[in-house]
Amino acid sequence: MASSHWNETTTSVYQYLGFQVQKIYPFHDNWNTACFVILLLFIFTVVSLVVLAFLYEVLDCCCCVKNKTVKDLKSEPNPLRSMMDNIRKRETEVV
């Protein structure tokens, strides 16, 4: 008799706890989804700007430079340009 009472008690406790548990659904609320999308767009914008700034410095295409000739631009010191010139000047060994 005591074991059946204990089983009934545990069953009722489980049922009571089952009603108290709330399932959590990510992005169930539209505001959460909107904030997440805005955050992703912000991160994408920042990363894109960093990549563009890096490429602008590395490539140094001089598209915006005025009143300079190609000869003037080539004569300016540029570590990347000198490295590329050194690579081009190396003799390749044909095997």
UniProtKB/Swiss-Prot annotation:
Alphabetical keyword list: Membrane, Transmembrane, Transmembrane helix
InterPro entries: SIM_Modulators, SMIM5/18/22
CC per GO annotation: membrane
Top-level taxon in the UniProt lineage: Eukaryota
Transmembrane segments: 35-55
Membrane topology: Single-pass membrane protein
Intracellular or extracellular location(s): Membrane
Keyword Transmembrane belongs to the record: yes
Pfam families in the cross-refs: SMIM5_18_22
PANTHER family listed in its UniProt record: CLCA DOMAIN-CONTAINING PROTEIN, SMALL INTEGRAL MEMBRANE PROTEIN 18
UniProt protein name: Small integral membrane protein 18
Organism: Homo sapiens (Human)
Gene name of the encoded protein: SMIM18
